[in-house]
Amino acid sequence: KVTNIIVHRTVDKVIEKELDIDNLYIINRDNNKNINMIDFNAVEVNKLLSKVINNIQNNFQNIEKGDLSKINIEELGLENYDKKNLKKGIIYRIPLGIIFNNTLLSNFGPTIPIKINLNGNISGSISTKVTNYGINNALLEISINLEINQLVMLPITTEKLSFKTSIPVAMKLIQGIVPSYYFNGIDKN
């Protein structure tokens, strides 16, 4: 849950600060200002992906080290967490009974700290989608796909967790010229 919050809030902040939607698309027009071609600006899109991944890694590493001076706790949605524990890199405390996978004992025993440990593996990609939207219009969408691998460290065991998400970044409606006639096939009736 914490990972999900940190990833989504980090992506939101990078997009809010760094994103100019018009730079993500290249639109070529003819002399009459009609659209000839639309393409995605690969350089700008990859810069955005790189900034997102770097910011997520930095936030996780700072939380892992307990260095709260370099992160904005409110922006990441961590204002309700115990700051003493966050300074130790602890993101959650669970009862000892949960480790034994027994529902009767799940709420009993002392609490065990769960530390965040970035396994050094955040991978990302950009997906683009073009959809027909009415007559001679197109809806362009750009999404960031992230996969994050982490280790959850408990005193008895260590478990590797994988987290995948797809976050929409930009949508743009491109309007072409509406033709003077439109033929949508022959109806047999």
Where are these regions (language model features)?
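Domain-level marker for long, solvent-exposed, non-transmembrane regions
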Residues: 1-189
